[in-house]
């Protein structure tokens, strides 16, 4: 195999410099709200707007009893459909049938489990599903969310002008309102990456921002209807790595691991389901890019294959690593893709992905990683360690991703 040596040398210099560099100082202001990517469960893909306080309580209980909370999944994100309009004073209220005890009581219950509660609204009069939005009531709603004990706001952009300056203004207004609410509430900018939020979302007070339209339960879009598969979102995220860091994250949308093509919004636009090899690749690359990890499968009826992927402590540790840098793709010839991410403790995370529909063999010169003669490769999925010199060799199944933590020896 012939390698593009000049490009590989550039990669060597870049990642050698990363290993020698000191971590950046802690981010200031709202950047300090989410110093590692938030993790939790989001209601939309499984339940859409068929949600209730009883369901949220069951999910909270389940997250604690099955080890998800201990693994780092701390948030329950209530998505669209909780709203019941506004009262006579224009205070936003929850649907009294779905949430008869009110949001404060629910937040208190979630907090009693050691978890955090997120909620949803929109930067327009109506939300994506046609419920009450927050446009024009930003300060009032932010104060209400604070009084309820909300910890996170997912703020959508349906029914709003397709203009970057307007989007920045609307998100900034809510970001300022949250900051003045008297409670620390993180802001998730859900604009879908169409108006370049990487350039303004952080300044608007966002702790994270979506990079794409909604993820669908598929490997990639093959029907041409605008659905986003796993590979489509990876492609979109690759060039955005430099915008990620502690307190400001690239949100690649929900994890579809374990949905199994069972319907709901994730099955729209060609979402027919994925193999567990593909689900494992989603977890791998979401962690490599330091994306938030929001589960969306049926927590109340899950299989062990799903749990094995979502509860992999070594993979989660990469996602939550204190350096907070997103992976960068190395310019490497051939079908397989190579990604590197700096980790604390003078380590690197290495991901090798086969995006093709055929098995692939790869020989990776270790000069891509650095100048050492020997490296210890810790296979994050197989939980095995091996020493490699000069070249790493491996075989990858279609759509498979292998992930290693790498240390010079």
Which role does the model predict for each range below?
Residues 11-23:
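Bacterial N-terminal signal peptides
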Residues 115-131, 179-196:
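Aromatic-lined carbohydrate-recognition surfaces of secreted/lumenal glycan-active proteins
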Residues 59, 63-164, 170:
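Aromatic-lined carbohydrate-binding/catalytic grooves of carbohydrate-active enzymes
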Residues 137, 186-298:
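Glycan-recognition surfaces
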Residues 388-409:
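C-terminal beta-strand-rich structural cap/linker in extracellular carbohydrate-active enzymes
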Residues 281-330:
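Catalytic cores of secreted or luminal carbohydrate-active enzymes
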Residues 37-43, 72-79, 116-121, 151-156, ...:
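Structural recognition of the beta-strand scaffold that forms the well-ordered cores
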Residues 280, 286-289, 294-296, 332-371:
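Carbohydrate-binding surface patches
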């Amino acid at each position: 195999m012939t390698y593009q040596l000049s490009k590989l040398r550039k990669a060597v210099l870049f990642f050698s410099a990363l290993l020698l560099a000191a971590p950046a100082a802690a981010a200031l202001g709202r950047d300090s709200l989410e110093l590692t990517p938030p993790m939790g469960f989001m209601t939309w893909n499984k339940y859409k707007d068929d949600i209730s306080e009883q369901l949220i309580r069951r999910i909270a209980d389940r997250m604690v009893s099955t080890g998800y909370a201990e693994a780092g999944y701390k948030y329950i994100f209530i998505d669209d459909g909780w709203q019941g309009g506004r009262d006579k004073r224009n205070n936003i209220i929850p649907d009294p049938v779905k949430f008869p005890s009110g949001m404060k009581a629910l937040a208190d219950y979630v907090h009693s489990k050691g978890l955090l509660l997120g909620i949803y609204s929109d930067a327009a009069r109506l939300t994506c599903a046609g419920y009450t939005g927050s446009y024009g009531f930003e300060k009032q709603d932010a104060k209400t969310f604070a009084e309820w004990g909300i910890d996170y706001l997912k703020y959508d952009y349906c029914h709003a002008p397709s203009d970057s300056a307007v989007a920045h203004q609307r998100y900034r207004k809510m970001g300022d309102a949250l900051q003045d609410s008297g409670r620390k509430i993180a802001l998730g900018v859900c604009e879908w990456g169409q108006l370049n939020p990487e350039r303004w979302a952080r300044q608007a007070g966002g702790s994270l921002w979506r990079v794409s339209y909604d993820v669908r339960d598929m490997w990639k879009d093959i029907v041409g209807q605008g659905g986003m598969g796993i590979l489509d979102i990876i492609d979109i995220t690759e060039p955005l790595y430099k915008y990620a860091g502690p307190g400001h994250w690239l949100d690649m949308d929900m994890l579809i691991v374990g949905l199994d093509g069972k319907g709901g919004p994730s099955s729209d636009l060609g979402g027919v389901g994925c193999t567990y090899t593909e689900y494992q690749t989603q977890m791998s690359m979401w962690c490599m890019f330091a994306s938030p990890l929001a589960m969306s499968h049926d927590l109340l009826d899950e299989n062990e294959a799903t749990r094995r992927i979502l509860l992999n402590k070594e993979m989660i540790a990469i996602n939550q690593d204190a350096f907070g840098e997103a992976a960068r793709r190395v310019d490497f010839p051939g079908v397989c893709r190579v990604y590197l991410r700096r980790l604390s403790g003078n380590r690197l995370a290495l991901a090798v992905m086969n995006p093709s529909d055929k098995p692939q063999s790869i020989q990776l010169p270790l000069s891509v990683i650095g100048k050492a003669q020997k490296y210890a490769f810790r296979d994050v999925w197989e939980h095995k360690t091996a020493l490699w010199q000069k070249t790493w060799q491996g075989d990858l199944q279609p759509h498979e991703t292998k992930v290693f933590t790498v240390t010079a020896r």
